[in-house]
A protein has these predicted regions:
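N-terminal helix-turn-helix DNA-binding core of bacterial DNA-binding proteins
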Residues: 30-77
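Amphipathic, non-transmembrane alpha-helical scaffold segments
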Residues: 22-25, 74, 118, 122
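Short, charged, intrinsically disordered terminal tails
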Residues: 61-64, 141-148
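Residue-level marker of regulatory loop/turn positions in helix-turn-helix DNA-binding domains and
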Residues: 10-13, 41, 59, 110
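Charged, amphipathic alpha-helical coiled-coil/dimerization segments
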Residues: 4-5, 85-144
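N-terminal leader segment of winged-helix/HTH proteins
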Residues: 1-39, 91-93, 138
Length: 148
């Protein structure tokens, strides 16, 4: 990533906005890590389950993701994603199924156990986001404000 110099000096309000936004993100991340840990999941395992369930698939009849797609969604290397999928399979949270369109490829699909865990986790995460909505809305509104 290349950093571009600011065309105008940043104001103290800009730094405050960035600090507040980073704090809100970290607060949510800490909540998420704790919620996953309560169900004996690492944050990366939780993110993987959510990616499999929540990523729009093409064609739409696909039930899972390929390992490479998981790597892309989690911003990790494919071999790291493959190891992660292996650990999730040993925990009976995912299964590997032949792609119905291309038998050489394998889709990673959630098990019923994972579906139940993910539903509980996702419900609590949505509740937390709803609780944070006023703060997030204020921060996002401030991003749209003209510099002071």
């Amino acid at each position: 990533m290349k950093l571009n110099p600011s065309p105008t000096p940043l104001s103290p309000a800009d730094y405050e906005l960035l600090a507040d936004f980073r704090y809100a993100l970290r607060t949510f991340a800490a909540f998420s890590e704790s919620a996953a840990a309560e169900l004996a999941l690492t944050p990366q395992q939780h993110q993987t389950l959510l990616a499999i369930k929540g990523t729009r698939k093409s064609p739409s009849n696909r039930r899972g993701l390929y390992v490479g797609e998981i790597a892309d969604r989690l911003l990790i290397r494919p071999h790291t994603a493959a190891e992660l999928v292996g650990r999730l399979a040993r925990l009976d949270l995912v299964s590997r199924e032949a792609d119905p369109e291309d038998g050489r490829r394998v889709e990673v699909v959630l098990t019923q156990k994972a579906e139940r865990l993910l539903e509980d986790l996702s419900a609590s995460h949505l509740e937390e986001l709803r609780a944070m909505r006023p703060l997030l809305s204020r921060l996002l509104t401030r991003i749209g404000d003209d510099p002071a």
